[in-house]
Amino acid sequence: GLAGSTCAKVLSGAGHPFVLCEASGRPGGRAVSDRTSDGFVLDRGFQVLLDSYPAARRHLDFTALGGGRFRAGAMFVGGGRPRCLENPLRRPPALFGALRAEVIPSGDLLRLLRLVTKSLGPGGAEETFSTGAMLRRYGFSETFFTRFARPFFGGVLLDPELRTSAEVFFGYLRRFVTGRALIPARGIGALAEQLVAGIPQGMVRYGMRAEKLVFAEGGVCGVRFANGVFLAGDEVILAVDEPAACRLLGSGRPRAALATAVHYFAADRPFYRGAWLCLPPRREESPVLHAALVSNAAPSLAPRGAHLWSVTVLPGHPRAADAELVRAEVASWFGENPRLMRPLAFIEVPYAVPEQLPGFRRRPSPWGV
């Protein structure tokens, strides 16, 4: 995955001998991209890189990744004519447009500015509250929840009920305010490919799924893999998800996982211009959280003359996999014929991120470290 690939890059740069073992046949873990036979690039879920992360700035070459960035703002759809609202912190005159649009009540816009200010300063964690409870404490209206909080931050957190710790919310808010969402030209899988590109040949091995840690004199002395190979080492770094860590260490129980799911559609023409994320009002009967013509941000994700839709849906919704329903809803936002959207794939990611409920940092580690 990205953590292991970054670790290997750092070790390689420092001149330390190591072997990076990857379970699959390529780097990236869940952050990989697949190219279809007709030239579309599909990520495992809607994935973007926020260029404000310090670690990303240290270890990645954004220019070499290519692609493009989404507009700082959102397109509000599903309630009449689509309306594009820009982030007023990046373009202050946009505040007047947001007030005129009346998509989000003016009082909520001012409350949101307060939260942004709080996120940029010290002590903005509020770790004892869920995101939803924190927003209600600040007095946000139900309209704000329906039109923005659930479709946008519910999608970011993979938690439309907003049960995730407010500490996590503030962390994401700070990154969105200070940076932009980037999609690499070759999809999100380009991140890990770039990280391992400079590692000497032979120091990365694929098809190596860790099966068991081998202990000696109270410490880990090596790893046995599913293919029968045993590798000894002075130090072993586990860069795996929680279920794998608990299994290998033989202790603890992983936190519940949050899932995600995405539909991809091809289109011969775009329904809108600009690199916008589309936010429909959150409705219980609909599985759709948000959508985007990702090829508007990174044209190389689709073959010449074609366009690529990414539509994020609630994985637990009874109609999440219904491509006909999903494309009909998306097309209705723009008054278009749903047949103009050709289904390409439906991708589910059962373990996207671990659940991060209020107080998650204070809970003892399941491994005692």
Feature roles, as predicted:
Residues 211-324, 332-333, 363-366:
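Mid-domain catalytic core of redox enzymes
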Residues 53-57, 61-162, 176-178:
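Mobile amphipathic helical/loop "lid" adjacent to a hydrophobic cofactor/ligand pocket
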Residues 169-227, 231:
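Helical element adjacent to the flavin cofactor pocket in flavoenzyme catalytic cores
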